[in-house]
C-alpha cells in the first residue's frame, strides 16, 4: 500500500506515453473543415465555392474496420458502398469536429495503401481512454470520391 503522499499513476501519464502511440502512426493526412462546393445561378451559371480550412496536417494511424460497418446503401437508385475507418491523431493535434474531411496523403509499409488519395468524412470523435490520442471514426464512401469510385 503506497503512502498517502504518493501517486500510483503519474499525473501526466498520457503525455509520457503519447510518443509510443505516435511512433505507431502509419499515415500522413490533411484534415479540412468548412468550405462549400459552390452552386448554380440560373442567370450567370456556376458560382464559386469557398475553400475549406486546413486544421491539421501530419502523422496519423489508420485502420480499416474488419467488417463493412455501414454496408451497402442505396443513394438515388444507385448502390453505394461505405466502409468504416478508424483514424487516430496525435495528442497535440487540435480537436476535430464531426463532419471534417480527411485526405489520406500517404501511408507507410504498415498502412492500408488503398486509402491513399481518398477523402474520409468524420462521423464521430473522442479520445482514447487515457487521452493518449484523438480517435476519429470516419466514413469511406467508396462511390463518392474526387477521383471516382474504387
Which positions does each model-derived feature cover?
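Short, conserved turn/kink motifs that form compact alpha/beta structural patches or helix kinks used as
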Residues: 1-9, 33-150
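N-terminal leader/capping segments at the start of a protein or of a new domain
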Residues: 1-26
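Hydrophobic, regular-secondary-structure patches
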Residues: 29-31
Amino acid at each position: 500500500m503506497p503512502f498517502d503522499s504518493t501517486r500510483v499513476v503519474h499525473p501526466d501519464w498520457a503525455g509520457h506515453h503519447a510518443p509510443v502511440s505516435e511512433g505507431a502512426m502509419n499515415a500522413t493526412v490533411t484534415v479540412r473543415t468548412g468550405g462549400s462546393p459552390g452552386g448554380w445561378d440560373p442567370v450567370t451559371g456556376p458560382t464559386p465555392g469557398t475553400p475549406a480550412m486546413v486544421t491539421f496536417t501530419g502523422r496519423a494511424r489508420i485502420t480499416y474496420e474488419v467488417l463493412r460497418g455501414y454496408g451497402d446503401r442505396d443513394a438515388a437508385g444507385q448502390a453505394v458502398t461505405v466502409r468504416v475507418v478508424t483514424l487516430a491523431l496525435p495528442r497535440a493535434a487540435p480537436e476535430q469536429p464531426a463532419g471534417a474531411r480527411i485526405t489520406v496523403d500517404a501511408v507507410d509499409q504498415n498502412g492500408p495503401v488503398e486509402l491513399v488519395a481518398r477523402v474520409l468524412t468524420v462521423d464521430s470523435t473522442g479520445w482514447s481512454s487515457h487521452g493518449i490520442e484523438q480517435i476519429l471514426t470516419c466514413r469511406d464512401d467508396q462511390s463518392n470520391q474526387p477521383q471516382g469510385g474504387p
